[in-house]
C-alpha cells in the first residue's frame, strides 16, 4: 500500500486508522464517497465498524471476491485486476474540481500536522532524517512503535519500497527481510528499522549479512521496553506495567561487532546524523543503537473499539486526564 500513491503529493494525507493522521481519519469520516482499492478493512483501520465512514457510499475493488463485505458491508463492489478496473473507471469520469472539499482537507492538514520533536533523539526524528538522507532506500521494519513511525514519517513515493509485517505483526521479521531485499537489490540502500525487543528475536542473522558482505543498515530504536505494549499499558491500563521492561544491560554494539558488523551507539540527534552518514558509506552491515526515551509514544492514536474520528494526540490525552 505505502508508495502506491506518491507520499510527496500535496493531496496525500497519510495513513488511516489507529495511528493514522487526524486529517485522514476525519476526512474518511466526513466523505460522501470512499473508494477502497485492495484493502481488507482490518480492525486497526475500521476502529468501530458500526461508525466507520457513516456518511459515505463505499466502493470496494479487489481481485479476491472473498475480501468483499468480509469485515464491513459496502454499497458497491468490483471484482477484478485493479489496473484494469481503474482504467475503466477513468473512462467514465468527468473533470471536477472539488474545490470546497480540497480546501476543507487542506485546512485539516494545517490544523493537524505531523510534528517532529525538536529536542532529543526520537523515532520520528530518525525516520525523517533517514528520508532526508536516503530518499530512494528500501525501508524494512520490525513490529511496534518504530513500525508506525516508519509508516508516518518516511514519504514513500514508489511501490514496494516498504517491507513490513502489517497484519501478522511478526516481531523478528525485519532483519531477514532486509537481507533478502539487499540480496535482490545490490545497488539499492536497504534499511531495517527495529525496536530492541524485535532485534533480540533474530539478531543472529547479522552473521549471515556479514558473511555475505551486505551493506544493509540496522537502526535499533532502543527504548529498553516493548514500546507499543507499554504505550497501551500507560494509556488504557493505569500504568500497570507487566513483562515490557528490557533494561537488562544487553550491549547491542558489542553483539553486532562480534558478528562482523560495524556498530555505533548514539544518544543525540547530532550523533545519529553522523552515524547514519557513516553507515551510508559502509560496505558491510552497519548497526546503529539509538537510545530513546522509554515513554515516547506514537501519535495520533485511536483507542481500541473507538470510531476513527475520535483520534487524539499527546496534548489531547493530557488535557483529558488532568
Where are these regions (language model features)?
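Short beta-alpha connecting loops at secondary-structure transitions
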Residues: 13-20, 69-74, 160-164, 201, ...
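A short alpha/beta connector and helix-capping loop motif
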Residues: 74-86, 204-222, 303
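Active-site diphosphate/adenylate-binding microenvironment
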Residues: 106-181, 235
Amino acid at each position: 500500500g505505502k508508495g502506491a500513491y506518491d507520499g510527496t503529493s500535496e493531496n496525500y494525507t497519510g495513513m488511516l486508522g489507529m495511528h493514522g493522521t487526524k486529517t485522514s481519519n476525519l476526512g474518511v469520516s466526513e466523505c460522501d464517497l470512499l473508494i477502497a482499492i485492495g484493502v481488507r478493512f482490518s480492525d486497526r483501520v475500521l476502529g468501530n465498524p458500526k461508525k466507520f465512514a457513516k456518511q459515505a457510499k463505499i466502493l470496494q475493488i479487489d481481485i479476491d471476491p472473498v475480501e468483499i463485505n468480509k469485515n464491513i458491508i459496502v454499497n458497491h463492489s468490483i471484482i477484478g485486476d485493479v489496473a484494469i478496473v481503474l482504467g475503466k473507471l477513468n473512462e467514465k469520469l468527468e473533470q471536477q474540481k472539488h474545490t470546497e472539499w480540497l480546501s476543507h482537507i487542506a485546512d485539516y492538514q494545517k490544523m493537524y500536522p505531523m510534528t517532529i520533536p525538536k529536542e532529543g533523539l526520537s523515532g520520528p526524528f530518525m525516520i525523517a532524517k533517514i528520508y532526508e538522507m536516503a530518499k530512494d532506500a528500501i525501508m524494512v521494519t520490525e513490529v511496534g512503535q518504530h513500525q508506525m513511525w516508519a509508516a508516518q514519517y518516511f514519504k514513500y513515493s514508489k511501490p514496494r519500497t516498504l517491507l513490513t509485517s502489517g497484519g501478522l505483526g511478526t516481531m523478528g521479521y525485519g532483519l531477514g527481510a532486509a537481507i533478502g531485499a539487499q540480496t535482490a537489490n545490490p545497488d539499492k540502500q536497504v534499511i531495517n528499522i527495529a525496536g530492541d525487543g524485535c532485534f533480540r528475536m533474530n539478531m543472529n542473522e547479522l552473521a549471515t549479512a556479514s558473511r555475505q558482505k551486505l551493506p544493509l543498515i540496522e537502526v535499533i530504536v532502543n527504548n529498553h521496553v516493548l514500546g507499543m505494549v507499554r504505550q497501551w499499558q500507560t494509556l488504557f491500563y493505569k500504568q500497570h506495567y507487566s513483562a515490557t521492561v528490557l533494561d537488562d544491560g544487553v550491549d547491542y554494539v558489542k553483539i553486532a561487532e562480534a558478528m562482523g558488523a560495524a556498530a555505533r551507539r548514539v544518544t543525540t540527534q547530532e550523533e545519529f546524523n553522523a552515524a547514519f552518514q557513516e553507515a551510508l558509506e559502509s560496505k558491510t552491515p552497519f548497526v546503529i543503537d539509538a537510545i530513546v526515551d522509554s515513554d515516547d509514544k506514537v501519535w495520533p492514536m485511536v483507542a481500541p473499539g473507538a470510531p476513527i474520528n475520535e483520534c487524539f494526540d499527546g496534548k489531547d490525552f493530557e488535557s483529558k486526564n488532568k
